[in-house]
C-alpha cells in the first residue's frame, strides 16, 4: 500500500495524522490502497485544477481523481489549504479538524461515495463525523454543513 502526501505550500501539515486518517477510512470501509497521492495545495492551484479538469471556475476544498473502481483504490486527490482555512472559520472548527475532514471526504470519494444529492451528502457527513471521532479530532456542529 502506497500513500504519498505532497505539500505544495509552505504551511506545515500533520502528515502522520493525515496518513492515519487515510488508512483508517480504507480499513473501516474494506478498501485496499494500491496507490494514493494526496496533494495539499493553495487556492490558485486548486481553482486551476477545478477549471481545467471539471470545467468549474470556482474555489473548492477537494478534487478527486479515482483511477480504479471498487475497494481496490488507486487515485489522487487535491486539497486546497486556503479553502480548508475558510471552512474552519465558517464552521467554527479548527484548521486541523477541517483538514482531516476534507482528507476523509476525499478518500470516501476515491472509494466511490458521491455527494451529489442531500441524502448522499448526509451519508458522507455521518462517515466523516464517525472517523473524526475515532481519530480523536472531535466534531464541530454539522447543522450548517447539512446545507452545503
Curated annotation (Swiss-Prot):
One of its GO terms (molecular function) is zinc ion binding. GO terms for cellular component: cytoplasm. Its cofactor is Zn(2+). Its EC number is 3.1.-.-. Keywords: Cytoplasm, Endonuclease, Hydrolase, Metal-binding, Nuclease, Ribosome biogenesis, rRNA processing, Zinc. InterPro entries: MetalPrtase_cat_dom_sf_prd, YbeY, YbeY_CS. This is Endoribonuclease YbeY.
Amino acid at each position: 500500500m502506497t500513500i504519498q502526501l505532497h505539500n505544495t505550500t509552505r504551511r506545515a501539515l500533520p502528515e502522520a495524522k493525515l496518513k492515519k486518517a487515510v488508512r483508517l477510512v480504507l480499513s473501516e470501509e474494506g478498501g485496499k490502497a494500491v496507490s494514493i497521492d494526496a496533494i495539499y495545495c493553495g487556492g490558485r492551484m486548486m481553482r486551476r485544477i477545478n477549471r481545467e479538469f471539471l470545467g468549474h471556475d470556482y474555489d473548492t476544498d477537494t478534487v478527486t481523481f479515482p483511477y480504479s473502481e471498487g475497494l481496490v483504490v488507486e487515485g489522487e486527490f487535491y486539497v486546497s489549504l486556503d479553502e480548508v482555512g475558510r471552512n474552519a472559520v465558517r464552521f467554527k472548527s479548527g484548521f486541523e479538524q477541517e483538514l482531516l475532514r476534507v482528507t476523509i471526504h476525499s478518500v470516501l470519494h476515491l472509494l466511490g461515495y458521491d455527494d451529489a444529492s442531500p441524502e448522499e451528502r448526509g451519508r458522507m457527513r455521518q462517515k466523516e463525523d464517525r472517523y473524526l471521532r475515532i481519530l480523536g479530532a472531535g466534531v464541530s456542529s454539522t447543522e450548517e454543513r447539512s446545507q452545503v
